Amino acid sequence: MLRISRVHIDYQKNPVGIAEMPQFGWEIVSDKRNVIQKAYTLQISKNPEFTEFVYDSGRVVSGKSAHLIPESGKLESATKYFVRVKADDGGDETPWSETAYFITGLTEGEVWSAPFVSAETEEADREVSKGTYVRGTFTVKKPVKEAYAMTTGLGLYNFFLNGEKVGKDEMTPGWTSYRRHLLYQTYEITDFLKEGDNVAGAMLAPGWYKGVMGLTKARNNYGDQTGFAMELRIRYEDGNEEQILTDESWKGCDSPIVFSEIYHGEIYDAGFEVLGWASKAEIPEGNWHQISVVPFDTNVIRAQSGARVQVIDEIPAKRIFTTPKGEQVLDFGQNMAGRIRVTATGKPGDVIWLKCFEVLDSEGNVYLDNLRAARAEMKYTFAKEGTITWYPRFTYMGFQYAQILSCPGEIKAENFAACTMHSEMEETGNITCSNPLLNQLHHNYLWGLKSNFLDVPTDCPQRDERLGWTGDAQIFCRTACYLMNTYTFYRKWLHDVEVDQTSEGGVPHVVPNIEEGKTDGNWLLSQGPHSAAAWADVAVIAPWTLYLMYGDTKILEIQYNSMKGWIEFMREHSEDYIWNYKLQFGDWVALDAEEGSYFGATPNDLTCTAYFAYSTGLFVKIAKVLKKEEAADYEDLYAHIVKKFQETFFDAEGNMTAQTQTAHIVALYFGLTPNAYREKTVKRLTELLEKENGHLVTGFVGTPYFCHALSQNGCVKEAYDLLLKEDFPSWLYQVKQGATTIWEHWDGLKPDGSMWSADMNSFNHYAYGAIGEWMYRVMGGMEADESAPGFQHVIYTPKIGGNLKFVDTTYHSVYGENRLKWQVDEGCVTMFVQVPVNTTAKIQLDGAKKVLDTDGLAFEKKQGYMEAEAGSGEYTIRYRQ
């Protein structure tokens, strides 16, 4: 049976907010082997009956089932389109797929026209962090066929129609480089409207826009007034259309949110509630006043079609306990990012007061020091007697625990639930194996992603930072792509990388660059506010990684000028191809740093030049993929950088001038080691590892590639040994200490229960979770092929080791489910492989001496392994090592 199991539209299911003709793709399943699509038919219609075609491809002879963009068909704004597809393999034909849909926002040629209205009209409002309401009324005079809303805000907003919150999105409009890039959200609102009087409204709060944020703790980073803008498109049954905008007739007043900030939490006083504020046509009671219109450059407003922040999971409190100091504490059993929903019964003046935190101290008491200045609290004051359920709307915290400072009535664990929040992305990868510690490690870096991919890839979710550090996002990118469908998330963020680049092409340390123009007085930024190696290289490495994982050249086309700008910045500021520029983080927080320093021992000119070469080499590949004539020029540049690196950082005997683990790792993994010295470099790396009793002492630059540098050079055992270390410093040390996420420091929590430091000690910092990439690519054996990216041709090449009895790895690509499970029994390996329809695979049996069961595949003997090509289907192979 041949059928289409799902349809992708711009990498999503039924996306809303499409601004241009999207990409289409589909997954085909079959119970046969070697199935390749020969033709497809794609239809787009304005109705689900498919009688009002916008596009009908007819039967197209093509094997393409991903990244397809129709060359004809014009989309209208604020319109719902229905999609279906069928395909055949030259013999069997699928039925029509289930009908999918997408909804457009403003399409090409239309510009944003709704003004921003603000209730913050007084000068004093500029310096406070309160919440406000804005509202307006309109009349629907006849039956509605369909209606859509496009909304955005300066600050954070929730949108209401006739008293109901519209959509599941939270923390809208998200965090972008607001002056250059602001997103609007699109909603289908037909069912929210009624004939007669209607009320539209929004709750607003400062958020990232005007709250206290960043390393410099500045207020009003993007503006000093919150605001809301709305455009409704209503189509009536009689064929007419009406447009309704925010305007000067709207009213505003303060809301019960008397304080709200990202770092510090939210305070809600129910005594200031205004009943019917978003549902009564007549002005309800309250201090309503005329709004002000906030000037804003509407040219930077763009549609958001995916990766919106939502409440994804709910975790009930596991227990309530009392610390040795007498503190009452909730334990949710998992470190996470989000908020707490609480149900309580009280009387006027009673207060619910919770303070969120990550870990207990060595005595088992509340530990808040690593939050630094972040208060991370939530407060609710009762206005009347009764039972309420409440949660903060415009903030989030990083926590496993919450201290109950005040709560009326009987306090029971069942009255508290943690609502985890992150950008909505489908989970695509999973690994389970015979070692439960490795299973927990996988859990930990997955939850590191869940906790920090909250609209931007932040470093941490708990302290007074939570910034889009480019280095963290770069080193974790490929791991993230295995774990979840991050294409839309990264595409949105990479646009901010581009718009925040300097005129020379330099890349800020954090994106969005909230620190722009605020370097004075900050010990770090005053040394250089942008363009650190490994951090800024995200401009090239992330688009390339997305291309490898999803097979889409569009991201390379979109980001090409950004990538080129970064390469040219490095070229301009290098001296004879050695690159080093102002503030460099180097091998950040490496354990070979001098006492009291965060900067590792590997010299900056080495790490900088290594990344200069690596990014330039990737850019050469990108230019060739896009068939750019200038590819040859950059190939020449790359050759010069590599030559200079080898002349500078290797001596005449082939020794590296820097005797650190990281120096050898990047030289090997980035392909910078002279061929004549490769074996010697590998040997020296293993010696440096042995010198530390088999432990790493690497930081942000060396850690992500350590196991790769070993396993790619014949040291698979050493790579597994490194991964499986259980004492400090190691990945599994954290697991053994009870971690449920990845820590910022290898010894954030020491064996005696004491802390690494108070000022920089996050327990939810995904960067070192980059080991996940090695676990998927090497331990799990699931590797993308550069010549057929996006897993159109997958290379199954697991390295057996680590005394593991089995490893079961799945990855859901744009073509379907890939699976590889290997199991070892007394020297005999059984490998189960699943290859999706319309893809092919290369299966490599590492160290195979004899294949006992080929399951119909033709294996050839290679140097150190056996290899066969396979079409789609399931295979079970047995071989002896």
Q: Which residues fall in each region the model found?
A:
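Active/binding-pocket-proximal capping segment
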Residues: Y157, V166-K168, P173, V497, ...
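Alpha-helical support elements that line or immediately flank enzyme active sites
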Residues: A147-T151, L161, R339-E358, F394, ...
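C-terminal capping/lid segments that line or modulate ligand- or cofactor-binding pockets
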Residues: A200, L204, D269, D464-E465, ...
